Amino acid sequence: MSDINHAGSDLIFELEDRPPFHQALVGAITHLLAIFVPMVTPALIVGAALQLSAETTAYLVSMAMIASGIGTWLQVNRYGIVGSGLLSIQSVNFSFVTVMIALGSSMKSDGFHEELIMSSLLGVSFVGAFLVVGSSFILPYLRRVITPTVSGIVVLMIGLSLIKVGIIDFGGGFAAKSSGTFGNYEHLGVGLLVLIVVIGFNCCRSPLLRMGGIAIGLCVGYIASLCLGMVDFSSMRNLPLITIPHPFKYGFSFSFHQFLVVGTIYLLSVLEAVGDITATAMVSRRPIQGEEYQSRLKGGVLADGLVSVIASAVGSLPLTTFAQNNGVIQMTGVASRYVGRTIAVMLVILGLFPMIGGFFTTIPSAVLGGAMTLMFSMIAIAGIRIIITNGLKRRETLIVATSLGLGLGVSYDPEIFKILPASIYVLVENPICAGGLTAILLNIILPGGYRQENVLPGITSAEEMD
């Protein structure tokens, strides 16, 4: 945390400052570079895994940008009790990717068509978002149950689950498996090229180059794919010039079993939002305790929930505040929430043009896989850092070991608990839910006094891992 505190003292534009237009524009573009790839990637991954049409995937990407713009506008402007009033940027929540793929794949194997799959996934996301809205009013109680150990396990399980998706894309994706080209030299070569470029730029001293490493790696991989004839532009031919958000475009359907899974992920992601908003307040030189802090926290989580309601209605995956932008604030020294207005407007404008979303659907799976395999592994590492924030004593070790064992075990064979009632099985067949719920249960059951010496001597915080 010392680095964050130090960065806060070097702000060029503080929270309520109004930078000149050209400086606000530069700051906005810098933030967009940090979030653009992670923002559109979830829709691309879900679209590829469920083999959605190019038009549907492009629409998901466009709506992700528009919803992110609306959410960012709400967060930075703070209307009444809604919004943090900080430079909190909204983007698609990676926590839902594996859940959406699992639920959608199950429906697909049962013979459901694309429109019904989308209506169901977005329907349960719409209803589930109200859980986040309600959670904003009971944050002190949730924080007692969902501790850093619990939230760290959830983040770790998300990363570990996504690695499988990343490595499949690395080999060419699900389409390549169907065509028999999975893991050929072209796919592996392009994926490896992207991975090497991303690693190389992440070793640079320049924060700007490190931040843009993934985008640069994707560009290099895309150019290589063009040269190898791996890019197909046919999906862009019939796209309209402008896309207008169409509420419940695919209809509305609801499954209680799916809601249990999605609702659990929503509740577990609340603490992630709390951490992100706290970090944003810290780097913006605002209080991280007291009445102002609690008010911003409540407003930020409330906005998270309302924005996910809007996002699900127009056709986007659920949203959350993005941690990457805290690094941009530190790097640029610009914490002005008025820069957030510029970012919000730019995102909405970009989302209105489906050709932009359509272009991203032409990126070969191997290109995405090369970057995403590393990114998802870093998510897992972030989970480990959260787990050891307050040390890893014997009580926490038992919670982590049991949760990790059951969560990973379920990912290896999801049918192990099939004997359970359907309403319970639908929860525990998902590794993220299985690991997260186990952690919550053990955190409640195991006595708080069961705390002996640190199992990892000398490690008392995540900072000591640096």
Curated annotation (Swiss-Prot):
Changing N93S: Increase of activity. The keyword Ribonucleoprotein does not apply. Changing D304E: Strong decrease in activity. Changing I432 to A/S/T/V: Strong decrease in activity. It is found in: Cell inner membrane. It catalyses: xanthine(in) + H(+)(in) = xanthine(out) + H(+)(out). The record marks H31, N93 as: Essential for affinity and specificity. Residues 1-25, 77-80, 142-151, 202-210, 280-298, 364, 447-466 are cytoplasmic. Changing D232C: Decrease in activity. Changing H31 to C/L: Decrease in activity. Residues 47-55, 102-120, 173-180, 232-258, 320-342, 385-425 are periplasmic. InterPro entries: NCS2 (IPR006043), Xan_ur_permease (IPR006042). The record marks N430, I432 as: Important for purine uptake and affinity. The record marks E272, D304 as: Essential for purine uptake. Inhibited by CCCP and N-ethylmaleimide. Specific, proton motive force-dependent high-affinity transporter for xanthine. This is Xanthine permease XanQ. The lineage of its organism: Bacteria, Pseudomonadati, Pseudomonadota, Gammaproteobacteria, Enterobacterales. The gene is xanQ.
